[in-house]
Structure formats: C-alpha cells, structure tokens
UniProtKB/Swiss-Prot annotation:
Region Disordered, annotated ranges: 138-215, 336-358
InterPro entries: Med7/Med21-like, Mediatior_Med7, Mediatior_Med7_sf
Gene Ontology molecular function: any one: transcription coactivator activity
Keyword Transmembrane: no
Protein name: Mediator of RNA polymerase II transcription subunit 7
Organism annotation: Schizosaccharomyces pombe (strain 972 / ATCC 24843)
Gene3D superfamilies (UniProt xref): 6.10.140.1520, 6.10.140.200
Amino acid sequence: MEPNEGVQLFSAFPPPPPYYKLFTRENIEKVISNMEKEAKHEDDANTLQPKTEEEIESLAKLFKKPSCLTSGTYQMFGDTWRLDEAIPSLKEFGIPELYKDIKDGEDEIEVVEYDPKSNAIVGTSFTRVHDYDKNSPIENEKILEDDQHTAMKEKDNESDKTMKDVEEKTEPSLKKEEEDIQMKEPLDSQDTGAVSASSVNEGFRADQKSKDGETSDLIKIPRRAYELRFLSRSLMLNFLELLGIMAKAPEQFPSKVENIRVLLLNLHHLINDYRPHQSRESLIMLLEKQLKHEESQVELLRTHNRQMTETLEKYKSLDFNMEKEGDVIQQLKSSIKKPLSGAEDEQKSRSMFSKNDEKLKKSLELMEDVIKRDLS
C-alpha cells in the first residue's frame, strides 16, 4: 500500500486504487494459466515468471475474488461501515439518557399501564405485537385522542399561568428587579434541568386509587410512545421556563438551552428506533402498489379478451356460405373480363347483386362498429 493511498481514500471522490495498473493483459493471462495448471496439479516453472515472491503474493491476492463479508466492518469512501446495523446508544456519544432502557423484542413490545387521571404508572408488561394490534385498536385510538386533547388543555393552562406569573413579577420597578437578580443565586442546572422521564416516573408512581378508594380505568400504551409523550411535555416545560429566564435574567439562559438540546437529542434517538418499522411498512406499501398494478393489467387483458370474443361471435352470426360467395366472385370476375351486352345481361347482374345486398350491408355495419370502438 502506497503512502498516499490512505489520504486519497478520504476524499469526496477518491481516485481508483493504484493497483489497478497491475491488471494488464499479460498478467491476466499468466494468472489464468497458473490457475489452470494448479487445478490439474501440474508444476510448471515457466507458467508464471514473477520477479520476486512478493509479486507472486500480490498478484494472487489481487486477482482472487474476495468472499462476501458476514460479520465485522468494511470501508467505503474512507468511512467504516458495520454489517450488523446496530444503533449506538446515547451513552456511547456521551449524552445522558432521560429514559430507561426499552426492552422491545422482535415479536413483543413493552407496554405501560397507567392511570390517565393521575398519570400514575401502575406497571409494565410485555405484549405480542399482533395481540396488541387486535386488542380493540379503534377504542385505543379514541382513548389516546381524548388523552392528547386533555394534555393540550393542561399545557395551555400551564402556559397561561406561567405568563401571568411573569407579568405579575415584572410589575415592580426596575430597581427592585435588579436587587432581586443580584441577591438571587445563579440557577443550578440540576435544579432547573430537563425533567427526565425516569424522575417524573418515580414522582408519578403514586397510588392509582382515587379518594373514594375505587380504581379508575387504566390505559395500556407502548412504553416508547409513553416516553415520547413525557419528553415532549418536558420540552414544552423547559421552553416556558426559558421564556421566564429571558424576561428576568437573560444571562442565565445557556443552561436551559443545554437542557432543551439534551431533550431534543433524546426525542430524536427514540424516533430513530422506528426506522426498521418504517422500512418494513414502506416495503409493504411498494409491494401492494405493484400488486395493484399487476391486477389492473390482468383486468385490462380480460376486457380485451371479452371484446375479441364478442366480435368473433358477431362474425359467426353472419353465416357466410363460402361456396355461394365463391360463385359470386367468379361471376363478378367474368363480368369484368367480358363487358355486359344487352338488356338480359344487365338484368342478370342486377339480380345477382340484389341477392347479396343484405349480407353486405350487415357486414359493413359490423365492420363500422368494430372500427369505431377501436378508435374510441
């Protein structure tokens, strides 16, 4: 490997590797002849005449077809790619994870059971994917829509309260605000940090019983969707807190912006876990589209087949007599060769044409219908 080869591989459009110059016609013929001799177990020193042993090894490696990789990594355009397509965790990138590990399998998913009134988590379980899809999907969708609607109302109420608090606190004079800001300690990132789903879960793990002692209706949703909902609410809360900080102490905004960045990275990582599901669904949609196209083509061929059979049936219904038609054609030919003379010959020709007028009219009408239908 030449010293410049490693640098060339990392360019946007790398040039071909330098060993392509070895693929000359002479070397190819030598390698082919050597392979044939090795297959026949014959030793011939004149078959390959390399200069050194290193040239023998290099030619053997270059002209040998590489085997397909089954594991490990490979390089392409200077980047290293993995064959197993494993999604790295946030911890590997040095980013804190705000949710617990989700243990979803190929055929089963982790489900959270919680109380919609108090948002208290009762427990977690595992459910097969097909069983969860069959378990009243319409009712689950309605419950989730109602829950989202109530959550949006709660967010609006919280935002209104926070804005009112900010307005009430900004009413005093500027001097009092400056004194409060100077006397107040800097906001600690841990106190006003991102509201992680794990910490919120511990706070929400309260008793699911109501004041009357009766258990309310519980909802089961996938753990991933539950964590995404919590992270979205935490993101909204941190954004509202950022607005309050910008109104009171703008110099303290970096910690809150960092919290928002961590929340967005966690949301992005959770959403990326749906990529395999998205690829499967996209493949299913493409296959369904191809199937519909093939079915439409088959139906089109069937309609053309029906039209052709109907046309042939109409032709059969005319009931042509080939012997009589042959006689008529011969009489026409003879009349053309020998011009008609006299009133008797003229009457014979008229009677001959009048017999076949009806059949000719029917055939012409049928041909007109067929031509019009084909043109349309």
